[in-house]
Structure formats: C-alpha cells, structure tokens
C-alpha cells in the first residue's frame, strides 16, 4: 500500500480485497455479517490513507515549514527537513517501545507522537484541522489507556485494551506507508531541474501539496452539489457571488535583495463558489457540457427549482448508469476481457468503438 501511493492512488482499491482475504483466512467460519464488518474496516483504512496520510504529511510538514521560515527566519526547507527527521525518529522510538513492551505510558505517548506527526488526525486546513487533530489524538490516547480484564486458566489479570502487538503492527504499517510516500521525493528532485513538463513546479512542501491534490485538474461535486443549470448564489450585498473560503495557497516570496530572509506568502485561497440549486449525487454538473448531457439522454425533461430547470434525480441516475458506468467503465473493461468491436473512435454510436459483447 505504501509503494502504491507513489505509483497510482487507484492501487488503494486493493485494500478491501486484501482485508477480505485476511478475514476469510483468519476466520474459516466467516459469515455475511463478518464480511460486511471487514469491508467497513477496509473503507476506513482507505479513507485514512487517502484523506489522512496523503494530505496529512503535507499539512503537518507545512506547519513546520511556516514556523521555521516565516517565524524564526530560517532558510527554505529547514522546517521540512526537521519534520522528516522527527517523523522518522518518532516511529523508531514508538516501534522500539511497543516491541520491548515495557512501560505502557511510554508506549502510548510514543504512539500518539508518531500518529500525530504522520498527519492522519489533522483533517482539513488551518485552525480547524489543528483542533480536530487534537481532539482525535486525545480520544486515541484515552482508548490506549483503557484496560480490560483477562481470565486465562483461572488467573485473573488486567491488561491494556490495545495490546503492544497491535500498536506495533499499526506503527509498522504506517512506516511502510511513509517509505512508499518517500518515492515522491523524486518529483521534487525532478522539479528542481526545471524540466519542460513541470506541473505545479513542486519544489517545496506547499507546491508538492498542490501536485498531490491534483489542483491543476480542478474538482467536481461528488455526493452533493450543483447541476449544470444551477445558478450561483448572490452575496448579501447583492453585488458579488457567494463563496465558501478554502485553504490558503503559499508561495515563496521573491527577494528584493540578497539580505532579505526567506519567507512564504499567501497568494490566494481555494475558494469555491456556492450555488442556489443543489442536488444529491450530481453527475451532470458542468455547465460547459450542458448540450452533451442533454444529447446523451435524448433530452432532459427536468423540473422547476426556484425558476431554474434542474434535471430530475431519475435523469441524473440514468446518465450515471448509461454513460459513466456503461460507456466509460464497462466498455473499457470489456475491451480487455472480450475484445474491441473496432478501432473507430466512438461517441455513443452502436457501431463504433464498443466491446464485442457490449449492450
């Protein structure tokens, strides 16, 4: 999983299959309930890696970089280098403590330090991410401190709720993620050479964050958001569109003289425009492709929402199934396993570019 982060994030989809294999091997009498629980655990693991480790290391590393550069006036990348050293050192300490299985207090403190430095608890940006992370770390420490009663062969004892073995396994797993994550160092090294293809120019912790979050491709609403016909919300002053404030984007400040200290400044924030009309699971959301949406569905009847014709949820789902699932997924899938109809570029026609058994 760690190395897969540096290859392609879609490799994370192997986690549910691996969890199920482990579950079926560990529990021969597996049932539907256990399988669903295993799948739920796998979803949590994928989310922890995708929304925790991947952006979390950038978040915490960015805090270190800003503090040492903007506050203490030290050169660029000083905070990043120190953060990497502390991250590695914290994992070495935590793995050693859990392997020795000595003081429970030292084990738990070392685990919390490593867990915090890898950035999983710090979801979001700014002070919100900081306080959210503190709460998650506090809850995690409380759980690690909990005890359970044990009765083996008539001998009663009190043991930690989370054993040293479990903590050690978790730390080793996170360490493997870090080792895989380190493959992105090649991107930074390549960018410093100023190659012709240098998207986002990831030469520091902040531009690397933009590269990893794929800012150059934009984003789209997933579970809830606007449709292609939605109108922007107007601010209270009646003069501007309404925006939701996003994370700040830092860039290196150009020096006016060689005596000036290195520093970062906020060049912009990742604000998102808000819309008056929204819907659940919006698949037809881009107003630049309104004509293509209606052409694919053979026309959109829609329904009126505040004077705006919005696609119905049924039309939205029909587009999702017919285009995104059938045409854009199953067609390519069956190219690999059944063969191509022909090599002519298809745009939805029944005689161009489908698979041999396409419906």
Language-model features and meaning:
Residues 20-29, 92-101, 142-151:
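Structural signal for the C-terminal ends of transmembrane alpha-helices
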Residues 44-65, 94-98, 118-123, 175-199:
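Membrane-lumen/periplasm interface segments of specific transmembrane helices
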Residues 1-6, 115-124:
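Membrane-interface alpha helices of multi-pass inner-membrane proteins
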Residues 1-18, 24-29, 167, 287, ...:
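Membrane-integral, polyisoprenol-dependent glycosyltransferases
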Residues 28-40, 72-82, 100-111, 126-131, ...:
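Membrane-interfacial entry segments at the cytosolic side of transmembrane helices
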Residues 168, 172-342:
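Aromatic-rich transmembrane-lumenal/periplasmic boundary elements in polytopic membrane proteins
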Residues 10-22, 55-59, 129-137:
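Transmembrane-embedded, aromatic-rich helix segments that form part
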Residues 357-359:
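Conserved small/polar residues in nucleotide/adenosyl-binding loops
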């Amino acid at each position: 999983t760690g190395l897969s982060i540096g290859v392609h994030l879609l490799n994370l989809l192997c986690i549910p299959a691996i969890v199920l294999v482990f579950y079926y091997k560990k529990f021969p009498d597996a049932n539907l309930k256990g399988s669903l629980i295993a799948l739920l655990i796998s979803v949590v693991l994928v989310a922890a890696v995708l929304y925790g480790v991947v952006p979390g290391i950038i978040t915490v590393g960015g805090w270190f970089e800003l503090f040492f550069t903007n506050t203490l006036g030290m050169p660029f990348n000083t905070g990043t280098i120190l953060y990497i050293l502390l991250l590695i050192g914290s994992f070495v300490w935590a793995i050693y403590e859990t392997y020795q299985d000595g003081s429970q207090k030292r084990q738990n403190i070392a685990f919390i330090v490593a867990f915090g430095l890898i950035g999983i608890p710090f979801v979001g940006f700014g002070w919100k991410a900081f306080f959210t992370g503190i709460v998650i770390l506090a809850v995690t420490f409380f759980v690690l401190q909990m005890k359970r009663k044990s009765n083996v062969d008539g001998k009663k004892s009190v043991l930690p709720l989370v054993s040293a073995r479990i903590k050690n396994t978790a730390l080793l797993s996170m360490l493997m993620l870090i080792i895989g994550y380190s493959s992105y160092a090649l991107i930074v090294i390549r960018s410093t050479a100023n190659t012709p293809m240098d998207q986002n120019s990831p030469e520091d912790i902040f531009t690397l964050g933009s590269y990893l979050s794929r800012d150059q491709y934009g984003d789209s609403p997933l579970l809830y958001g606007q449709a292609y016909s939605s109108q922007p919300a107007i601010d209270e002053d009646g003069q501007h569109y309404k925006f939701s404030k996003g994370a700040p984007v830092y860039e290196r400040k150009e020096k006016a003289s060689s005596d000036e200290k290195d520093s970062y400044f906020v060049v912009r924030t990742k604000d998102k425009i808000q819309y008056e009309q929204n819907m659940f699971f919006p698949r037809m959301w881009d107003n630049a492709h309104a004509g293509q949406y209606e052409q694919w569905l053979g026309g959109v009847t829609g329904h009126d929402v505040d004077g705006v014709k919005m696609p119905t949820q049924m039309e939205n789902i029909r587009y999702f199934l017919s285009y995104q699932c059938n045409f854009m997924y199953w067609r390519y899938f069956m190219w690999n396993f059944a063969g191509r109809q022909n090599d002519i570029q298809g745009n939805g026609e029944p005689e161009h570019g489908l698979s041999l058994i396409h419906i």
